[in-house]
Amino acid sequence: MTSLSTDFTEKLFADYEANAKYGAIENAVTHNGLLKSIETRQSEVENDFVFSIDLTKDEVSNQKASGRCWMFAALNTFRHKLISDFKLESFELSQAHTFFWDKYEKSNWFLEQIIATADQEIGSRKVKFLLDTPQQDGGQWDMVVSLFEKYGVVPKSVYPESVASSNSRELNQYLNKLLRQDAQILRDLIASGADQAAVQAKKEEFLQEIFNYLAMTLGLPPRQFDFAYRDKDDNYRSEKGITPRAFFEKYVGLKLSDYVSVINAPTADKPYGKSYTVEMLGNVVGAPSVRYINLPMDRFKELAIAQMKAGESVWFGSDVGQVSDRQKGILATNVYDFTASMDINWTQDKAGRLDYSESLMTHAMVLTGVDLDADGKPIKWKIENSWGDKVGQKGYFVASDAWMDEYTYQIVVRKDFLTAEELAAYEADPQVLAPWDPMGSLASK
């Protein structure tokens, strides 16, 4: 190993002081902050909020201090359809309802994984992976589908937000504390030679305690409820004693098995045209596993555009924190100019960023529009976020096409937009990725 010599460091001082530009940038950044000092005017000019395809201007939702973006994005795609179909002024489905059942199911999932890995050393990478975060707020499209199909949905008015759903830190802290304690008891019980029946009985005791904890922090979810509304024509409608699953079937009415997840992960370990799943990723035990098909970016974008041309918004996952201005709602590769200001060049490509842990899926949102040029190619994309209406343009964001290429990783589209060859590849036995693969990272946030 080579240490840093005094002579080398003195040379760096001299080189810095010889460049007047660095001094000017130093003054700007130390007074105004890094990104504000190097933000480009051009990125704002190029990325206005006018789109040739624009599906909705509905009010945005707000996940607040929680990691429920994947739920919000899915429920937002449903509510746009519901607002249109039933002629409503506005409407929101309960994210807290889905959140409750996800926490309940994830707790069971974790305990089952602990039982399945009881023969491994406590220091094994998989056991450590489980214990590092027994459960969290994040998730994947297939996981939210499992929740909707098992538990349905309810209007937000029926099961509103709580302090714990809007700010989940305390809820997660003590739920994970409880789950780690349960994990130790189960591993010790198995090590003592207890049979499967005894282990499952103990797990069920834990789940009663967990259910009680969730009900007391989030509120007991309804098994049936009454629902009434007036449409835009002032017609009154009501439902009495409807269940969450019946509400989903009647008011959402989508066959979720008709949708597939498409990823763009251009790394050597994930050839295009193949299906993939992620080990130990899920929430509902017994539900279909998370599955993706990996396709080139041009095809990936073709599918998203085709679905929006058909009038349907697109759930998608990206690395939203990369080169973005949250307040203005601009996601663009040229939003900050590190090259002209600081002589820093970003040369790492999308595959390199994935391989070297510089980028991963961090946030799910909804594509609700796109601006196409004369040849039908995308220029910029309209995004419905779930960070409230105080950021972006009343909560909507815009992404340049170059940003989409570099930092978008997943979309959910209808099966009938895939070719027969693509559908066959999706339905083939998937390659199993490691639990810590970046294509599973949206569920670890």
From Swiss-Prot:
Coiled coil: none annotated. The keyword Ligase does not apply. Keywords: Aminopeptidase, Hydrolase, Protease, Thiol protease. One of its GO terms (biological process) is response to toxic substance. InterPro entries: Papain-like_cys_pep_sf, Pept_cys_AS, Pept_his_AS, Peptidase_C1B. The active site is at 69, 363, 385. It catalyses: Inactivates bleomycin B2 (a cytotoxic glycometallopeptide) by hydrolysis of a carboxyamide bond of beta-aminoalanine, but also shows general aminopeptidase activity. The specificity varies somewhat with source, but amino acid arylamides of Met, Leu and Ala are preferred. PROSITE patterns: THIOL_PROTEASE_CYS (PS00139), THIOL_PROTEASE_HIS (PS00639). It is an enzyme of class 3 (hydrolase). Homohexamer. This is Aminopeptidase C. It comes from Streptococcus thermophilus. The gene is pepC.
